[in-house]
């Protein structure tokens, strides 16, 4: 039998272990054509409406602002095409706040027109500052040289061929003057000719587990000059992931991290090839950066690269776990003592009387898709900084019924990507990325017993708002909640007939209790206010600036 060339390449890259997954994908693809058609329509609508959205979104803020700081952009250049450098300079000149300087360090460009434009910029506006280096030190070395030129109290990284939104300087300085020493913003991509904007990247607030899985921070990264100097700027030896390494080190040392949920940076997509080998080099560098951080923090884990993604396996200690299996339906084989209960109404007292280190809440009718799912949940639950741990719940059509809860939505709580096909358009690779979330479903939830009891256990909800509420209570005492894609569960046919999101159709009493406890806008850190409130993680194109 002849295999297509792309299959042969994947086997060469990943080994024969990829074949079963590829077969499952082809079968699922055949079954999911209606879902793909719906998703394609949503993507097209987002694409069509985004140009108007970004024009509205970029309208300068009208409220008065008086800067008391200056922002220095660190811009390494090397043979930059003059038209791209000119576009960047113009985006700086068009800033709504003029308290900036641009520190260009040129790594011995051989293009005369690049050097000529840099020289001309210094004559055009004295905020453009240029140093011509004797050699090209690479991205890290050139950026660090630009850092030595900076005079502003705050500094920001900027690529030589990208664009800034008009309020970029203002928004960063507002955050800095509010006490932040590490700031990052949302971003999107722009076509090579600078006319078409696409693929907005709407980020969560600071999420340490998400950051270890991949550099979601990216552009714009800004920090106080004191903090940037304290961490040593960019480190050589992390080519392709030097920004990721920097974000990890800044996050460890920052006193206050602020995420600005506005698209303030446009990353230009040029026609440059990005081979698998380059991707592997970037992934390997990211894994080294993450491993370095864990060593600095004295956190014991193995860090590897799987499918070009960073995978962390935390060293586990012995834990006594008891499973509370609830609801009707079949139960999987469980490697721990199991207590079967009809529902979770009286479970708090049961946990109080149970002698264990951690509790696994598991709904009957779920079937594990990953063989080491228990150890995957346990390795996060044992961490002192973690509250609830959960994973993906997939229905019989491979669609997400749960992938972590967002709470600042009209229905009280909604699952990330509820009802969307697993192989479709997962935002930040939901099926492969460990993420921090506000809450997880009580259908699959592991938590240390002492944490569960210290926050008062489950509140008396009739719906799965209990899981979102428990996550908020853990968050309230400074703990993280974790979604891992490596402990997935498949629903049986009966559960698959439930609404796309487990909180959908919650009783009015549950919604009233949730609002009374957490207010009209609960503290949601990980689901962008620019997303649609249905959990789809598509941008809300109808949203007007200033609306909650």
Language-model regions, residue ranges each:
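C-terminal, non-catalytic tails of nucleotide-sugar-dependent glycosyltransferases
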Residues: 10-67, 280-319, 397, 409-436, ...
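Short aromatic/hydrophobic "clamp" motif used to bind/position activated sugar donors
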Residues: 155, 359
């Amino acid at each position: 039998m002849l295999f297509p060339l792309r299959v042969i390449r994947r086997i060469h890259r990943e080994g024969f272990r990829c074949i079963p997954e590829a077969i499952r994908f082809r079968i699922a693809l055949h079954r999911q054509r209606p879902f793909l058609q719906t998703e394609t329509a949503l993507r097209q609508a987002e694409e069509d409406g985004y140009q108007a959205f970004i024009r509205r979104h970029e309208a300068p803020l009208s409220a008065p602002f008086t800067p008391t700081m200056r922002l220095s952009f660190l811009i390494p250049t090397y043979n930059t095409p003059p038209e791209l450098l000119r576009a960047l300079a113009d985006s700086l000149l068009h800033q709504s706040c003029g308290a900036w300087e641009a520190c260009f360090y040129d790594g011995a460009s051989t293009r005369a027109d690049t050097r000529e434009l840099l020289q001309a910029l210094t004559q055009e506006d004295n905020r453009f500052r240029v140093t011509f280096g004797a050699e090209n030190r690479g991205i890290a070395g050139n950026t660090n040289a630009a850092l030595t030129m900076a005079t502003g109290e705050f500094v920001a990284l900027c690529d030589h061929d990208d664009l800034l939104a008009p309020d970029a300087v203002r928004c960063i300085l507002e955050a800095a003057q509010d006490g932040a020493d590490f700031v990052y913003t949302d971003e999107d991509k722009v076509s090579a000719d600078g006319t078409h904007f696409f693929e907005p990247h709407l980020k969560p607030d600071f999420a340490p587990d998400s950051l270890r899985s991949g550099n979601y921070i990216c552009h714009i990264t800004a920090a106080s000059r004191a903090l940037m100097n304290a961490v040593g700027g960019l480190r050589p030896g992390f080519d392709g992931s030097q920004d990721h390494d920097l974000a990890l080190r800044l996050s460890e040392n920052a006193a206050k991290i602020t995420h600005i949920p506005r698209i303030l940076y446009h990353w230009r997509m040029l026609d440059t090839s990005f081979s698998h080998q380059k991707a592997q080099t970037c992934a390997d560098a990211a894994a080294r950066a993450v491993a370095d951080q864990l060593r600095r923090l004295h956190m014991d884990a193995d860090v590897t690269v799987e499918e070009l993604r960073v995978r962390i396996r935390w060293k586990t200690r012995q834990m006594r776990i008891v499973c509370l299996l609830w609801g009707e339906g079949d139960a999987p084989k469980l490697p721990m003592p199991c207590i079967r209960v009809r529902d979770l109404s009286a479970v708090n007292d049961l946990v109080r009387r149970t002698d264990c280190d951690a509790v696994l809440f598991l709904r009957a009718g779920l079937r594990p898709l990953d063989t080491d799912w228990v150890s995957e949940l346990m390795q996060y639950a044992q961490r002192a900084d973690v509250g609830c741990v959960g994973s993906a719940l997939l229905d019989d059509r491979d669609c997400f019924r749960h992938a972590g809860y967002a709470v600042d939505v009209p229905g009280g709580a909604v699952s990330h990507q509820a009802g969307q096909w697993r192989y479709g358009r997962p935002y930040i690779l939901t099926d492969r990325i460990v993420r921090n979330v506000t809450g997880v479903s009580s259908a699959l939830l592991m938590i240390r017993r002492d944490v569960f009891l210290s926050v008062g256990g489950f509140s008396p909800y009739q719906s799965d708002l209990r899981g979102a509420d428990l996550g908020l209570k853990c968050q309230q005492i400074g703990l993280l909640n974790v979604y891992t894609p490596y402990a997935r569960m498949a629903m049986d046919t009966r559960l698959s007939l439930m609404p796309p999101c487990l909180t959908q159709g919650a009783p009015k009493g549950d919604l009233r209790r949730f609002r009374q406890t957490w207010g009209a806008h609960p503290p949601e850190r990980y689901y962008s206010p620019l997303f649609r409130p249905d959990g789809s993680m598509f941008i809300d194109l109808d949203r007007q600036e200033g609306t909650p």
